[in-house]
C-alpha cells in the first residue's frame, strides 16, 4: 500500500473516532462511525488476498447493518422527543435498538460470530486495529447514553459475552482467533459495569487496549500466528516470550498484574449493588479465558521442538528490532496494580 494512502486512512481513523468522541449530535456521531468503518476496510484488504477480501466484506456488512439501526433509532428518538443530543435517548424502543446496534459493532454475544472469522482473515496489525481502536467510538456512545440503558438487556449481553468468549477460545490453535474471543469476553466485562459505574468501563478499556496492543505488536514482530509457532520463540527472542507470558497472565486477571485491577473493582461494585450471583458468574467465566491463556503459556515455555544445544542460544545472536511502545505498554499492562487506590480516588 502506498505511504500516502496509508497516511490518509490512518488520519481518517483518527478523524472518525474523534468526531464520535466529541460529538453531541447523533448525526455527527454516526458520521464518525461511518468514517471509521470506511477507513479501516482498505487496511484490512492490504494483502490483496481472497481471505482478507472476504473478511472485509463480512465486516462491512455487519457494520453497515449496525449503522443503519443506529441511524434509525436516532431518528425514531428525535421524532418522539424532539432531541438530537447524543446523551439524551429517553425513548425505550430507541434505547433498545441503539444497544443492539452498538453490541453488533462491538462484537458482543450473541452478535459475536463475525469477530473471530474477520480477525483470522486479516493481517496481525489490521487485527490489532479491529480489536482495539475500533472499540473506542462505540464504547464512547455507550458511555454517553449509559443512564438510559436497560439493565436487564446489558446483563444478558455481558453474561453471554463472557461465557461464549471464554468457551469459544478453548479449542482454538490460531492466536488471532484466541485474541478475538478474548476481546469478546472483555467487552462483556465493560458492558456490565457501564450503567453502574461508567468510569470503570473507561479504565477497563484503557488497560485492555494496552494489553492487546502489546500482544499484537510482539506477535507481529515474531511473525507468530499459531500456538505451535511460539514453541520456538523462546530460542529466538527470550524477552518477547517473557512479555507474552506477562501480558497473557494480565489479560487473565491474575494478581499482582494490572489485569486484576479492573476485574476486582467491577466485582466489588457489583457486590455493593447486591448483584452477587452476577459477580459469581463473571468470576467463574474468567476461568475459561485463563485456561486458554495458560495453554498458550504452557505450549510456548514448557514445550520445545527437539533441537541441538546451539539453537538454544539463538536469542543472544538474534537481530532484534526495537519497537519503542512495547516496553511502555508492557509496564502499563503488567505493573499498575499498586496504583489501584489512585484510580479509585480519581474515579
UniProtKB/Swiss-Prot annotation:
It is found in: Mitochondrion inner membrane. Its EC number is 7.1.1.2. Its main location: mitochondrion. One of its GO terms (cellular component) is mitochondrial inner membrane. The keyword Protein biosynthesis does not apply. One of its GO terms (molecular function) is NADH dehydrogenase (ubiquinone) activity. It is a multi-pass membrane protein. Pfam families: NADH_dehy_S2_C, Proton_antipo_M. Disulfide bonds: none annotated. One of its GO terms (biological process) is mitochondrial electron transport, NADH to ubiquinone. The keyword Membrane applies. Keywords: Electron transport, Membrane, Mitochondrion, Mitochondrion inner membrane, NAD, Respiratory chain, Translocase, Transmembrane, Transmembrane helix, Transport, Ubiquinone. The chain crosses the membrane at residues 2-22, 25-45, 56-76, 96-116, 122-142, 149-169, 178-197, 202-219, 241-261, 278-298, 323-343. It catalyses: a ubiquinone + NADH + 5 H(+)(in) = a ubiquinol + NAD(+) + 4 H(+)(out). Core subunit of respiratory chain NADH dehydrogenase (Complex I) which is composed of 45 different subunits. Interacts with TMEM242. Core subunit of the mitochondrial membrane respiratory chain NADH dehydrogenase (Complex I) which catalyzes electron transfer from NADH through the respiratory chain, using ubiquinone as an electron acceptor. Essential for the catalytic activity and assembly of complex I. PANTHER family: NADH-UBIQUINONE OXIDOREDUCTASE CHAIN 2. Belongs to the complex I subunit 2 family. This is NADH-ubiquinone oxidoreductase chain 2. It comes from Metachirus nudicaudatus.
Amino acid at each position: 500500500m502506498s505511504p500516502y494512502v496509508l497516511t490518509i486512512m490512518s488520519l481518517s481513523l483518527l478523524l472518525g473516532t474523534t468526531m464520535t468522541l466529541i460529538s453531541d449530535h447523533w448525526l455527527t456521531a454516526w458520521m464518525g462511525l461511518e468514517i471509521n468503518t470506511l477507513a479501516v476496510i482498505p487496511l484490512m484488504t492490504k494483502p490483496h488476498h481472497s481471505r482478507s477480501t472476504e473478511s472485509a466484506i463480512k465486516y462491512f456488512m455487519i457494520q453497515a447493518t449496525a449503522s443503519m439501526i443506529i441511524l434509525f433509532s436516532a431518528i425514531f428518538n428525535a421524532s418522539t422527543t424532539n432531541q438530537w443530543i447524543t446523551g439524551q435517548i429517553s425513548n425505550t424502543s430507541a434505547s433498545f435498538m441503539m444497544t443492539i446496534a452498538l453490541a453488533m459493532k462491538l462484537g458482543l454475544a450473541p452478535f459475536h460470530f463475525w469477530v473471530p472469522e474477520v480477525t483470522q482473515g486479516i493481517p496481525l496489525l489490521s487485527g490489532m486495529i479491529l480489536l482495539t481502536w475500533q472499540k473506542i467510538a462505540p464504547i464512547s456512545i455507550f458511555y454517553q447514553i449509559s443512564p438510559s440503558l436497560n439493565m436487564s438487556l446489558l446483563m444478558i449481553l455481558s453474561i453471554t459475552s463472557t461465557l461464549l468468549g471464554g468457551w469459544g477460545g478453548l479449542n482454538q490453535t490460531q492466536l488471532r482467533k484466541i485474541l478475538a474471543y478474548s476481546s469478546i469476553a472483555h467487552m462483556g466485562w465493560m458492558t456490565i459495569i457501564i450503567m453502574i459505574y461508567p468510569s470503570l468501563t473507561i479504565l477497563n478499556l484503557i488497560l485492555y487496549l494496552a494489553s492487546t496492543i502489546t500482544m499484537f505488536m510482539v506477535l507481529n514482530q515474531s511473525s507468530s500466528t499459531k500456538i505451535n509457532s511460539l514453541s520456538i520463540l523462546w530460542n529466538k527472542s527470550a524477552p518477547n516470550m517473557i512479555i507474552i507470558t506477562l501480558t497473557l497472565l494480565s489479560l487473565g486477571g491474575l494478581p499482582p498484574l494490572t489485569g486484576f485491577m479492573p476485574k476486582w473493582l467491577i466485582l466489588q461494585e457489583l457486590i455493593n449493588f447486591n448483584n452477587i450471583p452476577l459477580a459469581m458468574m463473571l468470576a467463574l467465566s474468567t476461568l475459561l479465558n485463563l485456561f486458554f491463556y495458560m495453554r498458550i503459556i504452557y505450549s510456548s515455555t514448557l514445550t520445545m521442538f527437539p533441537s541441538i544445544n546451539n539453537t538454544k542460544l539463538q536469542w543472544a545472536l538474534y537481530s532484534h528490532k526495537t519497537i519503542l511502545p512495547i516496553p511502555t505498554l508492557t509496564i502499563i499492562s503488567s505493573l499498575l496494580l499498586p496504583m489501584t487506590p489512585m484510580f479509585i480516588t480519581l474515579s
